[in-house]
């Protein structure tokens, strides 16, 4: 096993093809981290000209100190049962990390617990310190240890039937409401950033500005690894649908009235009352859409998301939504359409991102888990974070300070949420 010098293209091709590959190990992802103070290096190892493992190393300077942290996000990408490859990856990483004055090397492989026995054993033998099996969204981790994933290598109907029953009803309703899911372009990021700002204000979290999302899009879209989706409500088509709906309801009402006049049966009267209630709701919706048409004849955007790719894996990233017309369930329409798009573009899985495992109802993470669990998902529990310490005194000092910083961040977050 030896060091290999490979191109960015060869690195990315290996990551996309490997079962332990991940979006965060793509070279273009490293470009998106520059705005937040990270820079990157790469290592690769192999034998007989064949790549056996790679690592994209992110470095960030420790404030007021001449040291850095080396972070291999969702790496290394290798077969963790291959001791020789793993050991060589560590050796090459140590050389680079020491040159960059890193006090530690942190990794968090995309390896699930039920497949991670070899990884745990071999990483421990190499001197890595395991950070434990804590909750998926523990503040002690950089990346979530648990995510929710929907298998999408199946037909539209099979994907739909994998959703929980109540969620299927919501998706059906969202499809009938008349919203339009658009695969947008760079210009659409302005609408997306505005939706994200609204979402942050509503849910109490700090949001990124437009330049951050432009950076992600510019870095990854050209290779087909980033797409922007927006959901638009256009009033004119919805008004046309409501008019057709009212015609059908009025016809049904007339038939029921005639039937009730001939024979006054309570069941017929109940049906008549139901139809009249539906007519009233449709009239109210028509008034609402007429008002929207006057104010926004071209429609308004209700939600959006970035859909990312790494080979056969797709990722739902940075979802945002408006406070208006939430009863139209735009996110449900968007999720189903993005899953189908991802499958059509080679993805076998659709990752909803981080979660805890069945949190209590009073947990701040319960709503997130409850939303993600109804989409035919399974819990992907990773083996977690590992640290390889290069500077023991500094590592211990930073580990002691980190809990205080975490508490401060939680306090700020709760203030934003008004708790």
UniProtKB/Swiss-Prot annotation:
It is an enzyme of class 2 (transferase). Signal peptide: none annotated. GO terms for biological process: cell wall organization; peptidoglycan biosynthetic process; regulation of cell shape. Keywords: Acyltransferase, Cell shape, Cell wall biogenesis/degradation, Cytoplasm, Peptidoglycan synthesis, Transferase. It comes from the Bacteria. Pfam families: FemAB. InterPro entries: Acyl_CoA_acyltransferase (IPR016181), FEMABX (IPR003447), PG_Glycine_Bridge_Synth (IPR050644). GO terms for molecular function: aminoacyltransferase activity. Gene3D superfamilies: 1.20.58.90, 3.40.630.30. Belongs to the FemABX family. Catalyzes the incorporation of amino acid(s) into the interchain peptide bridge of peptidoglycan, using aminoacyl-tRNA as amino acid donor. This is Lipid II:glycine glycyltransferase. The gene is femX.
């Amino acid at each position: 096993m030896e060091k290999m010098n490979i191109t960015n293209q060869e690195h990315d091709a290996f990551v996309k093809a490997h079962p332990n590959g991940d979006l965060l190990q793509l070279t273009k992802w490293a470009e998106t981290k520059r705005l937040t103070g990270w820079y990157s290096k790469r290592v690769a190892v192999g034998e007989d000209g064949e790549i056996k493992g790679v690592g994209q190393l992110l470095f960030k300077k420790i404030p007021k100190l001449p040291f850095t942290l080396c972070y291999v996000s969702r790496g290394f990408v290798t077969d963790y049962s291959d001791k020789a490859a793993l050991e060589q990856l560590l050796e090459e990483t140590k050389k680079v990390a020491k040159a960059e004055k890193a006090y530690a090397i942190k990794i968090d492989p995309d390896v699930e617990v039920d497949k991670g026995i070899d990884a745990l054993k071999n990483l421990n033998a190499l001197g890595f310190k395991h950070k434990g099996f804590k909750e998926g969204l523990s503040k002690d981790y950089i990346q979530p240890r648990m995510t929710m994933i929907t298998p999408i290598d199946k037909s539209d109907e099979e994907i739909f039937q994998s959703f929980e029953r109540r969620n299927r009803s919501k998706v059906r309703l969202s499809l009938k409401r008349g919203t339009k899911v658009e695969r947008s372009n760079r210009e659409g990021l302005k609408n997306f950033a505005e939706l994200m700002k609204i979402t942050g204000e509503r849910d109490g979290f700090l949001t990124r500005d437009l330049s951050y999302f432009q950076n992600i899009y510019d870095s990854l879209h050209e290779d087909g690894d980033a797409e922007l989706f927006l959901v638009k409500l256009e009033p004119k088509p919805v008004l046309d649908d409501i008019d057709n709906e009212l015609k059908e309801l009025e016809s049904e009402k007339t038939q029921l009235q005639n039937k009730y006049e001939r024979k006054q049966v309570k069941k017929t009267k109940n049906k008549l009352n139901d139809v009249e209630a539906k007519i009233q709701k449709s009239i109210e919706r028509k008034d609402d859409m007429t008002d929207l048409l006057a104010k926004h004849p071209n429609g308004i955007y209700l939600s959006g998301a970035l859909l990312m790719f790494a080979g056969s894996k797709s990722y739902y990233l940075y979802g945002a939504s408006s406070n208006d017309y939430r009863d139209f369930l735009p996110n449900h329409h968007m999720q189903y359409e993005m899953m189908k798009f991802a499958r059509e573009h080679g993805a076998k899985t659709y990752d909803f991102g981080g979660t805890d495992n069945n949190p209590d109802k009073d947990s701040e993470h319960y709503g997130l888990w409850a939303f993600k669990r109804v989409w035919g998902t399974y819990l992907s529990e990773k083996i977690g974070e590992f640290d390889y310490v290069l500077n023991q005194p500094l590592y211990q000092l930073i580990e002691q300070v980190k809990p205080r910083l975490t508490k401060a961040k939680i306090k700020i977050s709760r203030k934003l949420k008004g708790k």
